[in-house]
Swiss-Prot record:
Organism domain of life: Eukaryota
Protein name: Mediator of RNA polymerase II transcription subunit 31
Subcellular location: Nucleus
GO biological process, one term: regulation of DNA-templated transcription
Pfam families documented for this protein: Med31
Amino acid sequence: MASPEEMGDDASEIPSPPKNTYKDPDGGRQRFLLELEFIQCLANPTYIHYLAQNRYFEDEAFIGYLKYLQYWQRPEYIKFIMYPHCLYFLELLQNPNFRTAMAHPANKELAHRQQFYYWKNYRNNRLKHILPRPLPEPVPPQPPVAPSTSLPPAPSATAALSPALSPMQYNNMLSKNDTRNMGATGIDRRKRKKGI
């Protein structure tokens, strides 16, 4: 067994961690924004095709980076993502068959079309079924109509019941020959034909 003095000597031989560790001046904000921008670019099939054409998917470090980026699927990070398809494509990029298939332009077009059809049809149809609809209001039973003697209405009561005219109704009462459409000669410009 080693004496305590010998153990003290061994402890001094262990290198201490460097004192000049790098500290991010903005607390990781720039890295966060760069990763957010990159992951949202993955929502574009043309960009994935570009990465495949330039053989990024053959680099093991890049594949590891794509695996690392899966932390964006956690709830505390997903709230920052504006294009949720990027997470779907990130999941697909974990499959090597998908990575190699995206190098072909026809597969890029297929992915782009499927994405478009999802936005056009599925999402809207799905929302129709998800959003709550108000229940139809029950129609109250109408009381039986009692025979009554018809008296002519008083003129003041009729005037009080007539609704006020809206501005659109006032415009209909104006004549079609509005002075704004008249030229200096008094001819309606809307009705004038060329060549006369």
